[in-house]
């Protein structure tokens, strides 16, 4: 039931100054393919003071994640159950080791210099090639580092392309077959309440399911 987020080490890395300055919401459309065919959902990011809240729609009220790099914690909020789960984020050194083991050197990153306007922001198309397949990421440095809420909660390593490029956020991702699994549709700079980045007092803590070992 838990929709996950990997790249935990990315959350602990020091963001760039201009990324820290962003406060507001980022709305995106994310898609995936499964046994039942293509699926799509709207995901909302809220960013304030280094903290992040990711909200995903779904039956029974969906779920939200709060990431607090200073606490090295991730909180999964389950609104329908008035409950939450807590996860400790790995340290950056351990994440770098996992990234290297995952084969970061096998990924080739090519900046094309081609730019596009997406959701009112300028991004540069970057080709990420691995094992004969290339993915086009249109990246901006204005929103900080990306966290993928659709990935599984396995204490995942930093994605190889992020290891090479640093704190950049994809506004649009295009696969080799032309499909677009991620596209930002709206970016709004605005003040956000601290309460959005805290677990509600009425929520009860429940146990996080054990992670499956990679592979």
Where in the sequence are the language-model features?
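N-terminal export leaders
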Residues: 1-3
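Cleavable N-terminal signal peptides
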Residues: 6-7, 17
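Extended soluble regions of mature proteins
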Residues: 18-215
């Amino acid at each position: 039931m838990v929709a996950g987020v990997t790249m935990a080490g990315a959350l602990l890395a020091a963001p760039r100054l201009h990324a820290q300055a962003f406060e507001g919401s980022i709305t995106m459309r994310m898609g995936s393919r499964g046994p039942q065919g293509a699926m799509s959902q709207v995901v909302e990011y809220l960013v304030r003071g280094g903290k992040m809240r990711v909200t995903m729609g779904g039956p029974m009220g969906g779920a939200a994640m709060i990431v607090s790099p200073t606490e090295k914690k991730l909180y999964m909020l389950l609104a329908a159950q008035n409950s939450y789960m807590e996860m400790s984020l790995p340290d950056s050194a351990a994440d770098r080791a996992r990234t290297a083991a995952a084969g970061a050197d096998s990924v080739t990153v090519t900046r094309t210099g081609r730019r596009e306007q997406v959701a009112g922001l300028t991004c540069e198309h970057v080709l990420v090639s691995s094992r004969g397949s290339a993915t086009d990421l249109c990246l901006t440095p204005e929103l900080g580092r990306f966290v993928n809420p659709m990935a599984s909660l396995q204490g995942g390593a930093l994605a190889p392309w992020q290891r090479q490029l640093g704190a950049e956020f994809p506004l649009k991702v295009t696969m080799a077959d032309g499909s677009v699994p991620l596209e930002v549709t709206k970016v709004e700079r605005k003040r956000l309440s601290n309460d959005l980045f805290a677990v509600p007092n009425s929520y009860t803590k429940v146990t996080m399911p054990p992670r499956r070992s990679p592979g």
